[in-house]
Amino acid sequence: LLCVFVYGCGVIDKRPSPVYFGGEIVNPTSPYLVLFKDDQVIDSAKLDRSNRFKINFMAESEGLYHFDHSPQFHYVYLEKGDSLNLRLNTLEFDESIVFSGKGEEINNFIVELFLANEEDERIVDQYFQLEPDIFDEKIESIRQEKLAQLSTLLKEVSLSPRVTALINATIDYNAF
């Protein structure tokens, strides 16, 4: 009975599952988009006449991937069964990224977190002149704000423990 329960929860399901990653690149700087997991190429796609691409692959596991549209790249979190669309404009690469489809919530959150971290870097530079205790309070305030945003997201959508841990680690890393 325990085996049926564990199998039913997907804990031991190691079978690959299809993932779709596609979208549109406005003002492309390269004719290709390349998808990586760690440093390994998963697949590449040539942009069509409408600057659209699509990649279908069998995912062994969920995780952090990145796509490269030279000379830029960005991260994307893909899980088994995702069907994720991307739209971006290379003139404002990071600021224009929008995801839609299955997996959009976490990926749009990752983009927002990335952009917020860029902004925080400019703000934190001003804090270096403060006393250590006040500096720590300001940094902790920024961290708590991001954790509150994650908490709100978790109330709206169900995220895997792995991606939740990744986001928590990202928030903590950028606070220290």
Regions found by a protein language model. Give the residues of each.
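Sec-dependent signal peptide recognition
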Residues: 1-2
